[in-house]
Amino acid sequence: VFRTAMSPGIREQGDCFPMIANKEGKMVVGQFGSFIGPFLEAYNDTIEEGDIILTNDPYMCNAAVSHLPDWVVLVPVFKDGRHIAWSAMFGHMSDNGGMVPGSIPIEATTIFQEGIRIPPTKLYKKGVLQSDLLELILHNVRTPQWNRFDLNALVAACNTAAKRCVELSVRFGDDVLFSTMDIMLRRNYDAMKHIIGMFIPEEPRVFEDYLCDDGMGMGPYKIKCTMWREGEKAIFDFSGTDPQAQSSVNFFLNEDMFKMFFGSFTINVVDPQIVFNDGFYDLVDVRIPQGTLLKPNYPAALSGRTHALGRIFDVLGALLGMGAPEMMLNAAGFSDSPHLFFSGYDSRPGK
């Protein structure tokens, strides 16, 4: 991807996340956790060999992505006509249309102001590019050349991952491939069960933090979370979080995405040698009230969700650090990072 993408966001910043999942959609290897499960919950069409699905709309895929500039490519992996796995990747596009360049307007009050919305759609049908669909999408962004090359890079990466899955199946057989995936998921489950027992107490811990301002003079916005353990299961309850914002700082947080945050956070601190995947998700229960900053009602604006995302890591770090400050990173910082966009025209007409 880094060699074939064109935009600096993907090529230099690396704002893209690959994954390979089993046929049920659980990520076995990857970086960001699986967004296939939330997608499958909302997708009603058939899935056939050669199909490649594109989406960017949080409201149409149960927040498998959380704002419109993140374009998701999903490839079902088939071998001899049988669905055996998934490969998927999302990348942040430099522009998605909407009212400002970069497509993250702080003054947006609805998602309709933030650019083109792509429901889960077959970009390829049985291996054939739907070129009219692609041109329609690119006609609505300010950086069509960058987006085209970046999208092609995501598709090529997913196809390469799918090819490697098929090669493994041919070499070792389906049973070995499936059992290996199950073992990798189970190892992660066992590791996280131990970590949860070590660092999450049965008595509730509570922490809250704030987004001071949304850039439109409104705020602060409270993010509150209560954490405790029931048996082997960790519970995170965001009751008490403020209602959704009128501006774009809302973060439509899928429950599985928060599980990924929790897992990657703790694994990287406690034992970075553990392979991170979705195997532990049954050990975590996440509760997010509807209509809040973290689960806004449609059509709330979402483009500026990065600030709330960072603050969630601050809250999570504080909760975990209460009981183990020597082990857990508990210093805030990411949510205070500035996000600046610069654009303009060069000497070429219209560029």
Label every PLM stretch briefly:
Residues 1-49, 54-79, 83-351:
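Glycine/proline-enriched, intrinsically flexible loops and inter-domain linkers
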